[in-house]
Amino acid sequence: MKILVSNDDGVNAQGLHCLSEALCSLGEVIVVAPDRNRSGASNSLTLENPIRVETLETGKRYSVKGTPTDCVHFAVNKLLDPWPDIVVSGINHGANLGDDVIYSGTVAAATEGRHMGLPAVAVSLVGETHFASAAHYACLLVSRLRTHPLPSDQILNVNVPDLPLEQIKGIKVTRLGNRHRGEKMIVMQDPRGKPVYWIGPPGEKQDAGEGTDFHAIEQGYVSITPLQVDMTAYGSVSELTTWVGEFK
């Protein structure tokens, strides 16, 4: 089994190292990850600049001057022949819950893998301590996917509580919750007195009741949310057809 591993925290991130080491027990692991932290890159591609790749360990580990999506795109389309059997993204240093998935480079790397037709999993630790717990569940899921593949348009978004493995209560299949919108912008001055702006923290959780990814994490469970690459709102097609018909 050939496993492509990427992330958005960068090629030297602890979570990436822990994940790739754990997955070695399941097959051949190739790491292709950004050269630096690219959190919040979402599904962006580098189009106006060349993508430079540094080989850190031939056949095993590559550093890419680009986004998480660039990494998977390059690995599948150029680097790896034959293609990998699965894409695993993570372990992210922090949660990807609710609306976070819109911005997440971790989820984006998995999405690009699925867009290429490969099974894909995004794994995040809700904290920065117990990476071994997240790696354990990543291995369980990859093993399961090998024998029981998902539908062709789905990826798994996995969030793991920052707890020792023995304290995690189990797994819950969840839906995405959501947050209040984040409105805070942090204003500072550069050394020349000109204003600079930082995007502030995300909004507080809003829809976080039972059945959501937020709720599962709060209760000490691993949250697994199926996401789909096809973003069509099928439930609205009929209503929108009627709405558009009123223009005639």
From Swiss-Prot:
Pfam families: SurE. It catalyses: a ribonucleoside 5'-phosphate + H2O = a ribonucleoside + phosphate. It is an enzyme of class 3 (hydrolase). One of its GO terms (molecular function) is nucleotide binding. It comes from Tolumonas auensis (strain DSM 9187 / NBRC 110442 / TA 4). GO terms for cellular component: cytoplasm. A divalent metal cation binds at D8, D9, S39, N92. Keywords: Cytoplasm, Hydrolase, Metal-binding, Nucleotide-binding. This is 5'-nucleotidase SurE.
